[in-house]
A protein has these predicted regions:
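Short amphipathic alpha-helical molecular recognition features
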Residues: 29-35, 42-47, 475, 539-542, ...
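Hydrophobic transmembrane signal anchors and adjacent membrane-proximal interface regions, especially
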Residues: 72-74, 98, 115, 126-134, ...
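WW-domain-binding short linear motifs
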Residues: 1-52, 57-194, 204-205, 212
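A periodicity- and composition-biased signal for non-globular, repetitive helical segments
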Residues: 57, 104-107, 465-466, 590, ...
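SAM-dependent nucleic-acid methyltransferase catalytic core
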Residues: 271, 285, 292-296, 302-535, ...
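Generic recognition of well-structured, leucine-rich alpha-helical segments
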Residues: 4, 44, 48, 61, ...
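Charged, often flexible domain-edge or linker segments that flank or initiate folded functional domains
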Residues: 151-360, 366
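Domain-level detector for long C-terminal conserved domains
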Residues: 119, 124-125, 131, 135-226, ...
Length: 675
């Protein structure tokens, strides 16, 4: 039956078109059962036929008879073989199966691999008189059971799942217009962006060597990207281009901390002795080669020579003696060394930012030239007042035709290639991306652009991480599965404030890149996310400026909403010195409880979980983790951290720590030495 002549009683999203048919005067009298509403069905009235019918806003199906839901789990039963058949129909047909149009029988585009039919997620309206409508956790029986585009390997059947995309969201937001300032992703642009970011990293490396004689501090470029995007007003999703101040506090602090030499963790006495000698020698050499005041030269040279003389005559000192002497030397020489290095380090920060702004401008010009209809400056849309369940961010600018991306499989890895550039993801996460795309994308029902968008997504995160071994993965670490399960079961958590399509546990989350990630369930950056109600998990990247901005946003949201709102926050328990974000949360009037998980007694999931080996999936945390419950009054009533719930959460951490698989060496051990 055609949908053109029908009208839905309860339109649920701004992007859905409405028919000319009139709606019933009393929508509640036509409401179907709750389980059908959750699956996207609404009961409508056909003015032409003068009788009711059922319409599914996810699949655009229309039925005269009451739909029958199949109990279908797309992970354990991807073909819907165990789904309950519709009554009085062929058991081989899914619920409401219809004839396929001739256009659907035709082959897909160059990036299509003919996935199973499935609904896309839509927005959901909230009203005071009706309970919240909830989107289906899994689609009903697919109307055209198909096969995977790849051959199943034995590992597929035994693979452990690190996510639960069946959890229904309880996050409520105000309806928003599609984002008009983000350009749709394109492989050509993503390839050029990758080349420019790699070039920028190389410039940073060369500047540190030429001006200060040091290697760039590990992960400092990645944290620079995070810190800059907190305040950046530019258009590029990755490269900062419009920041005030120009000098990055994060990059400046980290480079200065490694001057005159980087201080590493010491285990043995001889290492401590060598480190003390190197520091004294480097400080003296630096003060001699820079434009320092006579007083600074005198202080640094005297302390350096005194330390060297002490090292020559005292060979019985312990490791602690050497470390105490090093700390004393840093206190005496550090301010003078920092003073002579200040202008040079500021020059490094300024040069990198200027190059980034130039690369960003160049990328946008090229990107606009690829679009069929370049966007025009539009007036800001008026704020929407309608409350809806959270849905993925939408782009206002339509996507152009995308070039071909090749897909093949090597053992357990899916390999996607564009112009000779290959990105990889394991089979399990590739299937996860397919599910997320199916639930979230509304402009590509035949998956014609799926492979291109997956390539752009993987390339973006590969470039953000960097090319070093384990580089960047520590900034994308995730909580263990057992902890997520407990958070959902005990505290109603259904949304992650800091995640990505690759490491998310739930199907709804906030992430760094709305342009690439929105097609896979993301709501965009958390600092732009304004929920009215819901229970959220927040495990931010360990960047101090980002965490501080996060706390400000938490308090604003909790102060403005009278609906149940809860944030369970996981941050490093850094105490020497303590981070501003942790101090502010501990003093917040919204803090309801605080837990401390000791170092080496809990784990994180690797940020490289989509490509790493199974025995490298988890790593031990070398720092304690503070768990803070920030809730408004209504959130505290609904999701209070009671002793019983807290005991379950602690037990979940213990369960994850008793894992028998070998643990890789922590990739975040250097974070303790960041100060």
């Amino acid at each position: 039956m055609s949908n053109d002549s029908q009208g839905s009683v309860c339109p649920t999203a701004s992007h859905l078109s409405h028919s000319p048919d009139s709606y019933s005067d009393d929508p509640l009298s036509l409401s179907p059962p709750d389980e059908l509403v959750q699956a996207g069905w609404s009961k409508c009235w056909s003015r032409r036929e003068n009788r009711p019918y059922y319409f599914n806003r996810f699949t655009n199906q229309s039925l005269w008879e009451v739909p029958v839901l199949g109990q279908h789990d797309v992970i354990s039963d991807p073909l819907g073989l165990n789904a309950a058949p519709a009554e009085g129909g062929d058991s081989n047909l899914g619920n409401g199966q219809r004839k396929r149009r001739s256009s659907e029988e035709q082959g897909g585009g160059p990036n299509s691999f003919k996935p199973k039919d499935a609904p896309s997620a839509g927005e959901r309206t909230l009203t005071r008189s009706v309970c919240y409508q909830v989107e289906p956790t899994t689609p009903i029986s697919p109307s055209t059971p198909g096969v995977k585009p790849w051959s199943s390997a034995p590992e597929d059947k035994q693979a452990q799942i690190y996510w639960d995309l069946d959890v229904q969201t309880n996050a409520v937001i105000r309806e928003q217009a599609p984002a008009s300032h983000h350009l749709p992703p394109h492989p050509e642009i993503e390839l050029q962006r990758a080349q420019l970011v790699t070039k920028l990293r190389q410039h940073y490396h060369e500047l540190c060597h030429q001006r200060e004689g040091i290697d760039p501090p590990r992960e400092s470029f990645n944290r620079w990207l995070l810190e800059r995007k907190v305040i950046d007003k530019g258009h590029d999703p990755l490269l900062p281009s419009d920041c005030d101040p120009v000098i990055s506090p994060s990059m400046f602090r980290e480079v200065m901390n490694d001057i005159p030499i980087r201080l590493s963790r010491i285990k043995y006495k001889e290492e401590a002795r060598k480190l003390l000698f190197k520091y004294a020698e480097a400080a003296k050499k630096m003060i001699d080669s820079r434009n320092a005041s006579p007083e600074s030269r005198k202080v640094v040279k005297w302390n350096a020579e005194d330390t060297m003389n002490w090292l020559r005559r005292d060979h019985s000192a312990s490791k602690e003696d050497y470390m105490d002497r090093l700390e004393h030397l840093r206190q005496q020489c550090g301010p003078h060394v920092a003073a002579v290095a200040k202008d040079s380090v500021e020059g490094i920060c300024s040069k990198i930012y200027q190059l980034s702004a130039e690369y960003s401008r160049r990328l946008r010009q090229t990107h606009l030239s690829l679009l069929q209809d370049p966007p025009t400056e539009a007036c800001a849309s008026p704020p929407q007042s309608r409350l809806v369940y959270c849905y993925p961010v939408r782009l206002a600018i339509p996507s152009p035709a995308l070039p071909r991306v090749e897909l093949h499989f090597e053992n357990d890895m899916a390999c996607l290639r564009f112009r000779g550039e290959m990105v990889k993801v394991n089979r399990g996460h590739f299937s996860k991306l397919e599910l997320l795309y199916r639930y979230s994308c509304i402009d590509d029902p035949r998956f014609d652009k799926f492979l291109s968008r997956v390539w752009c997504l993987l390339k973006r995160y590969q470039v953000m991480f960097g090319s070093g071994a384990n580089e960047g993965s520590g900034l994308q670490g995730a909580l263990p599965v057992s902890v997520f399960e407990t958070l959902n079961r005990q505290f109603g958590v259904s949304f992650e404030c800091f995640a990505s399509p690759l490491n998310c546990y739930f199907k709804q989350f906030c992430s760094a890149f709305p342009d690439t990630d929105g097609f896979f369930g993301s709501r965009g950056p958390f600092l732009s996310f304004c929920p009215v109600s819901g229970s959220f998990e927040a495990n931010p990247p360990f960047c101090e400026e980002l965490m501080d901005a996060m706390v400000t946003h938490f308090e604003d949201l909790l102060d403005q909403s009278s609906e149940p709102l809860s944030f369970i926050v996981f941050v490093p328990e850094w105490r020497d010195p303590v981070t501003p974000a942790l101090t502010r949360m501990e003093a917040s009037r919204f803090l309801r409880h605080q837990l401390s998980i000791p170092a080496y007694e809990h784990e994180y999931r690797s940020g490289s979980q989509h490509i790493c080996k199974r025995d490298e999936m988890y790593y031990r945390a070398v720092h304690g983790t503070a768990v803070l419950f920030l809730q408004n009054d209504a959130g505290f009533v609904k999701w209070a951290p009671t002793p019983e719930r807290l005991a379950e959460l602690t037990a979940a951490y213990r369960a994850s720590s008793t894992r028998t698989s070998s643990l890789s060496q922590s990739v975040s051990s250097d974070l303790e030495l960041r100060q």
